[in-house]
């Protein structure tokens, strides 16, 4: 399909695969369509209760390959990669923000957002402890101050793995 942008392909793939994966007990976390090392690559990130293993990735790959081939959404030759979202899992849906409440997150807005906390200047990035999703906004504690970032202003949000905290818990 000539002329279709990277975002459009990812959106089309998402709409094709999401219902199938949900039926099979998986959550479609993210779809990326990008040119890597000179080759087109479709990355499909999945999750499920209890986590994702290599067998899950193989099973999902076998499930989605024929769907993508029949739908013929992607014209150029490409590599398909299926994996877990990793330690820095992206957060997109309102339920993601509630599910990971208590975790450290980084949130990036499309542009500067004013009024996220009383007296706070407009900003584009926040890193803090996720409190959840309320009334159309993501709530997070940044250095003891509660910020509310409107969901429709968020370009990207993801978990931040706390290496030091994890090491302290193991001692």
UniProtKB/Swiss-Prot annotation:
The keyword Methyltransferase does not apply. Keywords: Cytoplasm, Ribosome biogenesis. GO terms for biological process: ribosomal small subunit assembly; translation. The keyword S-adenosyl-L-methionine does not apply. It holds the Pfam family DUF150_C. One of its GO terms (cellular component) is cytosol. Disulfide bonds: none annotated. It is found in: Cytoplasm. Belongs to the RimP family. Required for maturation of 30S ribosomal subunits. This is Ribosome maturation factor RimP.
